[in-house]
């Protein structure tokens, strides 16, 4: 129901620096550094279209139809080193997304037992801005990208989808495949990637989409939709 693009973490971090100035209207590169939402991935949007996920957000928050862009990182391969690296990633992530729970339990000695990082580092991270703490996370991930050949998207890690992982060799070579009227780069070992992702990917499945709740309209801008929807809600309430 949408397009997901995966990039190695080092390429992804480069993109974060380049993309905001590279993409011009009507396209908009959206990340934690361009908007109020804090995500561990990015979106490339078409501002002429509508893909409303949050109908209570103001027009300044771009909600055009999007491509999701996810970084691939090294992950736990069973070794002691990668277990530690993965646990530190989780610690930093908690300091970004669960900081209120940490700060509310700051005097509870048991909370410090769950972290691999020491208390001083945790407190330093939770007192950073969300964006600065996210930069720490992204830089740490890039530093350890080549520590193992086992890769995983961090969003899968967070959601507990641990069955899914990728071998680095699957991405060693790329080839170009036809997608509608364009050619897109895909891993030469795309069958291995698809099997890991979907198991029986050659069998069509009719099911609800992940983004079934999104309001999609390719013909009008999300700004127009929000304006008309806001007026509608106001009239109903009156």
Predicted feature residues:
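Catalytic metal-binding acidic patch
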Residues: 1-16, 181
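Conserved catalytic core of two-metal-ion nucleotidyltransferases
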Residues: 19-77, 97-197, 204-238
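A short secondary-structure junction signal
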Residues: 78-84
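Short, His- and charge-rich active-site/binding loops that engage polyanionic ligands
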Residues: 88
């Amino acid at each position: 129901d949408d397009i997901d693009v995966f990039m190695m973490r080092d390429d992804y971090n480069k993109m974060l620096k380049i993309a905001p100035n590279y993409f011009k209207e009507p396209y908009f590169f959206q990340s934690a550094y361009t908007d109020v939402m804090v995500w561990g991935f990015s979106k490339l949007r078409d501002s002429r279209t509508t893909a409303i996920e949050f109908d209570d957000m103001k027009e300044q928050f771009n909600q055009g139809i999007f491509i999701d862009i996810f970084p691939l990182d090294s992950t736990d391969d069973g070794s002691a080193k990668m277990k530690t690296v993965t646990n530190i990633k989780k610690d930093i992530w908690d300091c970004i997304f669960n900081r209120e729970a940490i700060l509310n339990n700051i005097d509870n000695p048991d909370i410090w037992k769950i972290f691999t990082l020491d208390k001083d580092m945790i407190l330093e991270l939770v007192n950073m801005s969300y964006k600065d703490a996210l930069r720490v996370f992204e830089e740490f991930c890039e530093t350890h990208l080549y520590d193992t050949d086992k890769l995983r998207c961090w969003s899968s890690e967070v959601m507990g989808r641990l069955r899914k992982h990728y071998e680095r060799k699957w991405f060693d070579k790329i080839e170009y495949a036809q997608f509608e009227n364009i050619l897109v780069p895909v891993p030469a070992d795309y069958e291995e990637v698809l099997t890991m992702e979907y198991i029986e990917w050659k069998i069509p499945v009719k099911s609800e989409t992940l983004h079934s709740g999104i309001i999609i309209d390719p013909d009008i801008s999300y700004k127009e939709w929000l304006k008309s929807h806001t007026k509608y809600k106001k009239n109903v309430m009156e």
